């Protein structure tokens, strides 16, 4: 089917986020400077008669996102390292269409995604970073729009295979970031 930008209904989104900055409380300097987070998000479609995600029935999706960021044990001591993992269900819909990578949004993944990164602060406003993201899809359509043509198929299904569905994507990048 040809993707379209027609009105296909509404969507409800909800997110709960827990973030702890300094998880050691005096146990060690490393833990005192560690940030951890956990996020649970839900999307619920309310399609009109045109259908959304391949059906006119309402579908609920979810996403879990966990991460930790801490001081890098390798000098210089102003560097930080982080690890993040997220998992999205078959009907998960994110609002991350502004993603700026060729691989697409890891948060939109219907499956699992892992990211490891290192950020080096160069000045108060300038930093340098490297990251690696691996996305493994369980269902098709992770970064697509809604319409009836957006039905998610199991990645191992005949429909997915016939349409050349992407099973895995990687993003490796080095970047400079300036904070205004």
Report the location of each language-model feature.
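Outer-membrane beta-barrel pore domains
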Residues: 1-180
């Amino acid at each position: 089917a040809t993707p379209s930008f027609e009105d296909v209904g509404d969507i409800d989104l909800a997110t709960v986020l827990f973030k702890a900055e300094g998880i050691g409380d005096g146990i060690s300097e490393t833990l005192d400077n560690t940030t951890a987070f956990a996020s649970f998000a839900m999307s619920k479609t309310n399609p009109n008669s045109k259908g959304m995600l391949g059906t006119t029935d309402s579908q609920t999706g979810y996403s879990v996102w966990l991460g930790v960021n801490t001081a890098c044990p390798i000098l210089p001591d102003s560097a930080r390292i982080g690890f993040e993992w997220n998992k999205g269900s078959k009907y998960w819909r994110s609002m991350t269409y502004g993603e700026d990578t060729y691989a697409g949004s890891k948060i939109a993944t219907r499956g699992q995604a892992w990211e490891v990164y290192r950020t080096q602060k160069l000045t108060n406003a300038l930093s340098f970073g490297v990251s690696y993201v691996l996305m493994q899809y369980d269902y098709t359509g992770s970064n697509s729009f809604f319409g009836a043509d957006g039905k998610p198929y199991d990645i191992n299904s005949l429909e997915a295979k016939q349409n050349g569905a992407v099973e895995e994507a990687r993003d490796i990048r080095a970047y400079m970031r300036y904070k205004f």
